[in-house]
Amino acid sequence: MRKLSSYIGRYWYGYVFAVASMVTAIALDMLYPKITQKIVDDVILGGQMEILTKLLTGIVLVGIGRSIFGYCKEFTFDFLSSKIGAEMRKDLFNHLQTLSMRYFDDTNTGELMARVKDDVDKIQNALGYVGMLLIEVTIHVVFVLYCMFSLNWKMAFLPVTVMLCCAVVAIIMERKLDKVYEDISEENAVLTTVAEENLAGVRTVKAFAREDYEIKKFLSHNERYYNLNITQSKVLVRYYPLFQFVGKVLPVAITILGGISVMNGNMSLGALVAYVEYSRNCTWPMEMMGWLTNDLSSAVASYKKIKKIYEVKPEIEDSRNVVTLDHVSGNVEFDHVSFKLDGKQILSDISFSVKEGKTLGIMGATGSGKSSIINMLHRFYDTTEGSVRLDGVDIRKISLRQLRRSVAVVLQDVFLFSDTIEENIKMGNRSTMQMDEIKSAAASAQASSFIEKMDEQYETVIGERGVGLSGGQKQRISIARALSKHSPILVMDDSTSALDMETEHEIQKTLNSLKDTTKIIIAHRISAVCHADEIIYLQDGRIAERGTHEELLAKKGLYYDTYMAQYGGYLAS
């Protein structure tokens, strides 16, 4: 992760301008007590009425200048923090895109949403308004103390001592808040995850009448989040009143001490008035200390959470010596492939090859490792043993971009984006795809019939995760998306399970017409794979049977049992 200093360094000129504007505005602020001193000593007590107009004009000009430079300061800080926040969000999102599937298997979506949105917002706030105030408080205090020392250096030791004490208290407060904010950030991510999962699966929740259970689960996390915020509040209310008390008492103490100096002839009345004004300028930084410490502690906790994400390195990366294939024919070979995940053996000694334009069918019981073959081919995971080759080249040597562009896939768990049907179909070939190609892909996937009955047709906006469409309709749009990619390899993972037999037959005819496309079809239905050039049947991560449809039936093994389970009743009748 780039350090915050590197983000700030990119816009150093902006921060220089903002700080210069701030210094100018603060310097102008320091003139008010000086002018007040002149009015008291020279006009009221000295009777020099002729300079009153000049002094009043000075107040107006100082006010105008203060407003202009104050605007420049605040606008620049806001602009720069928004810019840096956007860049941090972009960099974090880009980093997430590089991470391997294993990371997303182990990390909740709600947690990542909290990091990308809430935590970056807190850092952005720290670099903007909070950061501006922190710098302003520091510069303001330096200017005020300089002016106070120039008026009466003995009395200036009082505010210096008070400020040092407040700084120590602020450090103690920050240390107490640090762990609390880390816990709050963590629980916020959990709460977001619970809410996101519940709302995404609201139909399932209602179908199983699980509303009460989900409410209790949410409330338990909500209560913990509430308790953590109460813990935070207890720390704040313990220290906030101290800062406010000191801020109110200091001007009074200065007035008393200054009054004694005036009576002893060591200070003019105007100087005392100016000194009290300067002391009031000391109070708001002290009152702000608690608030600034609170927000900075929150931002630091958020930064630590984001930093942890950047510490995660992608397990799947391009090799140093990438091989670029001039033309991908689509020859796929698994050579003694084995795969373990979290110590569990998923695939064992899998070997097969599919030539260009040929079709491989893969069957097996749930959990037999069928979908893991897709994960290997896409390099979502790397093999534990053996190798996967594309056109004779180990896919670990091919760039991930070229590899994944060469494979179109229809996943078992169909995911459609909250966008138009058109955008969902042309996702795989977005930059060059024309409308007639989209319609052709939809027709090939038997999707055009229901799409064109919709009021907006291809401009129809699909609800979140395809809400509003049936399972079969979602599968057909997903198939159209894969076909529109025109990749040399097409993988279908149980992608016709929600289709009626007639629609499945039409799609099968489309697949058969793709003579130059290598097809790997994973299915539970015999009808989806019976036309394949070769069929492999997996059991417990191993190839138990292989052959053509007719050869496997003749063996009367697992494939035959599946066939009889699906068609036995029909054959008997």
Positions of the model-derived regions?
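ABC-type nucleotide-binding domain
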Residues: 319, 325-573
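Hydrophobic/aromatic residues in alpha-helical transmembrane segments
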Residues: 32-36, 73, 77, 92, ...
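Hydrophobic alpha-helical transmembrane bundles that constitute the permease/transmembrane domains
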Residues: 19, 23-34, 63-71, 123-126, ...
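An intracellular "coupling" helix at the cytosolic face of ABC transporter transmembrane type-1 domains
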Residues: 101-102, 118-127, 131, 135, ...
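Short intracellular "coupling" helices and adjacent cytoplasmic loop segments at the cytosolic face
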Residues: 45-46, 82, 90-114, 118-120, ...
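Helix-loop-helix
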Residues: 48-50, 54, 147-162, 231-304, ...
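Transmembrane helices of ABC transporter permease
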Residues: 10, 14-27, 57-58, 62-65, ...
